[in-house]
């Protein structure tokens, strides 16, 4: 299990390229997602009345993300969806 705390995480530098899901373990804080075109999105994460997870952070679209506050998250590779016939 990989746990992340406050900091900036850059795909290809300190985080392998791929698609990831983030799950809040404790605390709360702001997740700032920066795309390759420098557009940003913000999501409040937390255990109380905030988003408890964020799925689908994709390095093909996102160049980095930042966690602020005292939030502690688990990051995991996103699972491939299996489509039934």
Model-derived regions, located:
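Primarily secretory-pathway and cell-envelope proteins
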Residues: 1, 25-85
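A glycine-anchored, Pro-Gly-centered beta-turn/N-cap motif
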Residues: 5-11, 16-19
């Amino acid at each position: 299990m990989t746990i992340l705390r406050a900091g900036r995480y850059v795909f290809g530098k300190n985080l392998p390229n791929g698609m990831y899901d983030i799950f809040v373990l404790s605390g709360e804080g702001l997740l700032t997602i920066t795309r390759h075109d420098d557009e940003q999105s913000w999501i409040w994460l937390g255990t109380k009345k905030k988003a408890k997870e964020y799925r689908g952070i994709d390095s093909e679209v996102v160049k980095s993300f930042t966690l602020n506050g005292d939030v502690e998250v688990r990051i995991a590779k996103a699972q491939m969806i299996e489509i039934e016939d």
